[in-house]
């Protein structure tokens, strides 16, 4: 090894030891011919001092991010010069030998100056990601990720799981998003697809008798750009045979408890649960943030006989802002703009005066009886503001759910040190395909219905006989885990019987021919004693970003993509040469298409 110690691990117990350190030059200070340098390696920082004239003369040439090796004696810092903010802050190294391992060019941004971190644009950071990762916070993010990986593996190996790698070159099968396609050079005109998840392969592993599988899996989805999404991402993927929902949930909670402990947090299990219907009714979201206690109150029945046209709608709901009646008019107007940015016409409101009198546009348009009872109905007290949404149920609840979060932010109700986990269970098995498309998802099949989770999720046992007769009422045997308003994992008990799987395909408008072509290998496998099985997949990037307190999942990915799936570091995606295009066979016609075209041409010539 080129060094004997790590810089950040030097302590008073090392005083009088001769040490060799390696690392990068951080901050440098010159004091009357004596040079002080913060030497940084993966463990942290140590102060090294150049006092001897010859070595100090050479140290004058050192600049930020030079890679160096130093040898010297560990000494106690002079009294009063200790740095309590550094683990090594009680000592320094008096350098006797200096070796420059490599020089550094002028930096595109400062690395050791935390005050400048927010001034560096993300494109620049990602273009020079290898420098960005030298920052303590960014390097620590990847080390935290490694610890989380190890913690999950520890739990799974304790339960006799087998880590298995599944293919990353497979066939294109519809799973809810667009596939990334890879041309197959040896079979011109055909393509592999990068997997959106290991879903089908892990189910086949259950058929194969592996019983307990896991994988830290890379997944790929060619989606339109959305905030804080990545075209390639990581899942902790887990599957088990001969289990029910309770077994999977218990294991998932054990994994999360162990992972959270790596960051020094203790979480209490079992986690609370709520149904999907309750989550939407009370919080306007299937991933509610439960760190604050604001709930939506349904007012549809209350206003069933109203003369106010705005409230003569399918749904009316409300949320209360504590003390919100004191907001100035400009703030109330800002709420209207906020709602319009979310596709709503506005956000109706009533102000409850300190004397209990109601004011605002809505108060003037509702009946005396409605004015007399609305505050009690929604739980508002003098000084509060009641915000309303009216319209179709789904979008109105979504608006109120967003308002709920905005109110909590404005009132400072969100405790960033708190972890609020909940399971959301009993989600619908199917949703209208039009709704899925409106949200930017790919609706599989050619039906009015598409799967909410995926096509391989089993219905709850009580809907097994009826889900294809009444798809809108069927509930999925599925469970999502939510933390602080973020969905961090989701799973289900899977279909393991061929006839049930074929019935699901029929509901989704996937013909027998298409099912056979795209999923025949899975249907065939179900014919050979497939066991009952289920599992869960955790969004690993999201979990690590939450653990580390990062604003974006990009901070916990070594080399992430920026907006639109572009990699500023390598400038990917890039064009290919004409030779590469020809060799890949990307423009070749598949044999079936070519044969069909030839047949059509022959027929037309007769």
Swiss-Prot record:
It comes from the Bacteria. L-aspartate binds at residues 175, 221, 453, 494. The keyword Cytoplasm applies. Residues 578-590 have a biased composition (Basic and acidic residues). ATP binds at residues 221-223, 230, 487, 539-542. GO terms for molecular function: aspartate-tRNA ligase activity; aspartate-tRNA(Asn) ligase activity; ATP binding; nucleic acid binding. SUPFAM superfamilies: Class II aaRS and biotin synthetases, GAD domain-like, Nucleic acid-binding proteins. One of its GO terms (cellular component) is cytoplasm. It catalyses: tRNA(Asx) + L-aspartate + ATP = L-aspartyl-tRNA(Asx) + AMP + diphosphate. Residues 593-606 have a biased composition (Low complexity). Residues 564-606 are annotated as: Disordered. Residues 199-202 are annotated as: Aspartate. It is found in: Cytoplasm. NCBIfam families: aspS_bact, PRK00476.1. Homodimer. Aspartyl-tRNA synthetase with relaxed tRNA specificity since it is able to aspartylate not only its cognate tRNA(Asp) but also tRNA(Asn). Reaction proceeds in two steps: L-aspartate is first activated by ATP to form Asp-AMP and then transferred to the acceptor end of tRNA(Asp/Asn). This is Aspartate--tRNA(Asp/Asn) ligase. The gene is aspS.
């Amino acid at each position: 090894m080129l060094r004997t110690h790590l810089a950040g691990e030097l302590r008073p117990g090392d005083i009088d030891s001769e040490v060799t350190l390696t690392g990068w030059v951080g901050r440098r200070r010159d004091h009357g011919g004596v040079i002080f340098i913060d030497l940084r390696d993966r463990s942290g920082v140590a102060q090294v001092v150049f006092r001897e004239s010859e070595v100090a003369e050479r140290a004058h040439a050192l600049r930020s991010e030079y890679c160096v090796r130093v040898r010297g004696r560990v000494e106690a810092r002079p009294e009063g010069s200790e740095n309590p903010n550094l683990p090594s802050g009680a000592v320094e190294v008096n350098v006797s030998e200096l070796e420059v391992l490599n020089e550094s060019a002028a930096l595109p941004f400062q690395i050791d100056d935390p005050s400048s971190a927010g001034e560096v644009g993300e494109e620049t950071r990602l273009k020079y990601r290898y420098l960005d990762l030298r920052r303590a916070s960014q390097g620590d993010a990847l080390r935290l990720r490694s610890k989380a990986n190890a913690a999950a593996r520890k739990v799974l190996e304790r339960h006799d799981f087998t880590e298995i790698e599944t293919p990353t070159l497979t066939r294109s099968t519809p799973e809810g998003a667009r596939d990334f396609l890879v041309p197959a050079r040896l079979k011109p005109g055909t393509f592999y697809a990068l997997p959106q998840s290991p879903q089908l392969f892990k189910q086949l592993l259950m058929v194969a008798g592996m019983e307990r599988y896991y994988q830290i899996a890379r997944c790929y989805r060619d989606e339109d750009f959305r905030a804080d999404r990545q075209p390639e991402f990581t899942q902790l993927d887990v599957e088990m045979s001969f289990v029910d929902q309770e077994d999977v949930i218990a294991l998932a909670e054990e994994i999360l408890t162990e992972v959270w402990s790596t960051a020094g947090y203790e979480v209490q299990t079992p986690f609370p649960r709520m149904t999907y219907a309750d989550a939407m009714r009370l919080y306007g979201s299937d991933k509610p943030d439960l760190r604050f206690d604001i709930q939506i109150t349904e007012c549809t029945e209350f206003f069933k006989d109203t003369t106010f046209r705005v409230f003569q709608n399918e749904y009316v709901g409300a949320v209360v802002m504590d003390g919100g009646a004191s907001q100035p008019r400009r703030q109330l107007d800002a709420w209207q703009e906020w709602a319009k940015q979310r596709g709503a016409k506005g956000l109706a409101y009533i102000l409850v005066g300190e004397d209990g009198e109601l004011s605002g546009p809505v108060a003037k348009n509702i009946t005396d009886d409605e004015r007399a009872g609305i505050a009690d109905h929604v739980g508002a007290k003098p000084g509060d503001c009641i915000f309303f949404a009216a319209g179709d149920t789904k979008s109105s609840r979504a608006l109120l759910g967003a308002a709920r979060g905005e109110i909590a932010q404005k009132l400072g109700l969100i405790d960033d040190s708190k972890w609020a986990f909940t399971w959301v269970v009993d989600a619908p098995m199917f949703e209208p395909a039009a709704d899925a498309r409106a949200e930017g998802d790919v609706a599989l099949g050619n039906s009015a219905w598409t799967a909410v989770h995926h096509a391989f999720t089993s219905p709850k046992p009580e809907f097994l006989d009826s889900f294809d007769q009444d798809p809108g009422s069927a509930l999925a045997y599925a469970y999502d885990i939510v933390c602080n308003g973020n969905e961090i994992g989701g799973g289900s008990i899977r279909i393991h019987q061929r006839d049930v799987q074929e019935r699901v395909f029929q509901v989704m408008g996937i013909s027998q021919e298409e099912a056979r072509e795209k999923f025949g290998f899975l249907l065939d496998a179900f014919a050979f004693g497939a066991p009952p099985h289920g599992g869960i997949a955790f969004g690993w990037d999201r979990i690590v970003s939450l653990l580390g307190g990062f604003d974006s999942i990009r901070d916990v990915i070594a080399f992430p993509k920026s907006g639109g799936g572009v990699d500023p570091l390598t400038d990917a995606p890039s064009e290919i040469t004409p030779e590469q295009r020809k060799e890949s066979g990307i423009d070749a016609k598949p044999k079936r298409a070519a044969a069909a075209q030839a047949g059509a041409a022959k027929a037309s010539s007769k």
